[in-house]
């Protein structure tokens, strides 16, 4: 503790109270964004609460700390050079604004979802402020390749070790060293799979290297992933599924969280259970008793018909609630609002 107490302020994690001059803010009520619900819910795996209500992580190859009050989102940026110690620039604030997609009104979306779905209305009362991040497609792709048959804690560890081994070193704060996300060439290197296995990625190591090589050698590089942002949802989903280690669920995660496809509904065991338990949903096109490609597509259509073009965002609210308070959902299947359209599978 003595060592940490003597670190210069430029080498320590900041808090809003300890260095207010180095922070800037964006008007943003908690009903539009709850950092604790968004940054620790399995969207990104690179944010940690380093001090109470202060979240630190890497965004756009810079290290940030975020916190919030009832009506403001605060941020500070560590640039790695004492001569550049200053509050975030307008450009950096714009980066944060785009990352949280703050141009999308959660109030309007929640109001619509509650008007057509009584179950959502009940759950949302305690889970305001859940929104989708707009992540870098490369980081999102390889993070979710690591998510196969995994949980949030283990995925977080895998992604962190991957960044430490293959990503550029950015800065050390207290006893934490931050790294940027690796580029495709680093992940496609001849020794990458062996190294990734030693880091605990298991069979996913082969998929990480193979997908990096496929993008570089068959698709022309990272620009291909960026171009999928403007492709139709079905086209982008199909293209992602050609990559090693990317199935329908992982492709939907990438579409939703990195490729501007808010209608994408990733289906895993949690979402399947929510649909079965809280909506009385059963697949009509297959006999599947759990997630499968055909049944997952049917379930995605069910939720898209119910919630509309931002169905993936609504699903994220229920997913976040189910992770934290599954008892909220242990009631008879939801009744739709009188007069609302009954979705079809």
Curated annotation (Swiss-Prot):
Binding site residues for DNA: 149, 154, 204, 270, 287
Gene3D superfamilies attached to this UniProt entry: 3.30.310.40, Helix-hairpin-Helix base-excision DNA repair enzymes (C-terminal) (1.10.1670.10), Hypothetical protein, domain 2 (1.10.340.30)
EC number: 3.2.2.-, 4.2.99.18
Pfam families per the UniProt record, alphabetical: HhH-GPD, OGG_N
Cellular component per GO, a single term: protein-containing complex
Keyword DNA repair recorded: yes
GO biological process, one term: regulation of DNA-templated transcription
Subcellular location: Nucleus, Nucleoplasm; Nucleus speckle; Nucleus matrix
Active site (catalytic residues): 249
Superkingdom of origin organism: Eukaryota
SUPFAM superfamilies, A to Z: DNA-glycosylase, TATA-box binding protein-like
First-listed, main subcellular location of the protein, grouped into a coarse class: nucleus
GO MF term set: 8-oxo-7,8-dihydroguanine DNA N-glycosylase activity; class I DNA-(apurinic or apyrimidinic site) endonuclease activity; DNA binding; DNA N-glycosylase activity; enzyme binding; microtubule binding; oxidized base lesion DNA N-glycosylase activity; oxidized purine DNA binding
InterPro entries: DNA_glycosylase (IPR011257), HhH-GPD_domain (IPR003265), HhH_base_excis_C (IPR023170), Ogg1 (IPR004577), OGG_N (IPR012904), Oxidative_DNA_repair_enzyme (IPR052054)
Reactions catalysed, as given in the entry: 2'-deoxyribonucleotide-(2'-deoxyribose 5'-phosphate)-2'-deoxyribonucleotide-DNA = a 3'-end 2'-deoxyribonucleotide-(2,3-dehydro-2,3-deoxyribose 5'-phosphate)-DNA + a 5'-end 5'-phospho-2'-deoxyribonucleoside-DNA + H(+)
Annotated tissue distribution: Highest expression in testis.
Family: Belongs to the type-1 OGG1 family.
Summary of the function given for this chain in its UniProt record: DNA repair enzyme that incises DNA at 8-oxoG residues. Excises 7,8-dihydro-8-oxoguanine and 2,6-diamino-4-hydroxy-5-N-methylformamidopyrimidine (FAPY) from damaged DNA. Has a beta-lyase activity that nicks DNA 3' to the lesion.
Protein name: N-glycosylase/DNA lyase
Originating organism: Mus musculus
Record gene name: Ogg1
């Amino acid at each position: 503790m003595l060592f940490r107490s003597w670190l210069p302020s430029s080498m320590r994690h900041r808090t809003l109270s300890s260095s207010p001059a180095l922070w800037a803010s964006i008007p943003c009520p908690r009903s539009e964004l709850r950092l604790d619900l968004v940054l620790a819910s399995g969207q990104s795996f690179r944010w940690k609460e380093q001090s109470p209500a202060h979240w630190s992580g890497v965004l756009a190859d810079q290290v940030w700390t975020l916190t919030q009050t009832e009506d403001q989102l605060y941020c500070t940026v560590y640039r790695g050079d004492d001569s550049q110690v200053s509050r975030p620039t307008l450009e950096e604030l714009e980066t944060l604004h785009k990352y949280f997609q703050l141009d999308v009104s959660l109030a309007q979306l929640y109001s619509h979802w509650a008007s057509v779905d009584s179950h959502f209305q009940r759950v949302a009362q305690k889970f305001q402020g859940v929104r989708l991040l707009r992540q870098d497609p490369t980081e999102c792709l390889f993070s979710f390749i690591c998510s196969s048959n995994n949980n949030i804690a283990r995925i977080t560890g895998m992604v962190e070790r991957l960044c430490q081994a293959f990503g550029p070193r950015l800065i050390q704060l207290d006893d934490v060293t931050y790294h940027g996300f690796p580029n495709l060439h680093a992940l496609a290197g001849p020794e990458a799979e062996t190294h990734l296995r030693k880091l605990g990625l298991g069979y996913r190591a082969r998929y990480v290297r193979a997908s990096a090589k496929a993008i570089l050698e068959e698709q022309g590089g990272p620009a291909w992933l960026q171009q999928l942002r403007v492709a139709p949802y079905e086209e982008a989903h199909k293209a992602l599924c050609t990559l090693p280690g990317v199935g329908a669920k992982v492709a939907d995660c990438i579409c939703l969280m990195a490729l501007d496809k808010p209608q994408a509904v990733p289906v895993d065991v949690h979402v399947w259970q929510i649909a079965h338990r809280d909506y009385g949903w059963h697949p009509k096109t297959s006999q599947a008793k759990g997630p499968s490609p055909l049944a997952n597509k049917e379930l995605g259509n069910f939720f898209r018909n119910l919630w509309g073009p931002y169905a993936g965002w609504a699903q994220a609210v229920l997913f976040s609630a189910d992770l934290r308070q599954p008892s909220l959902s242990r009631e008879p299947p939801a009744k739709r609002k009188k007069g609302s359209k009954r979705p079809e599978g």
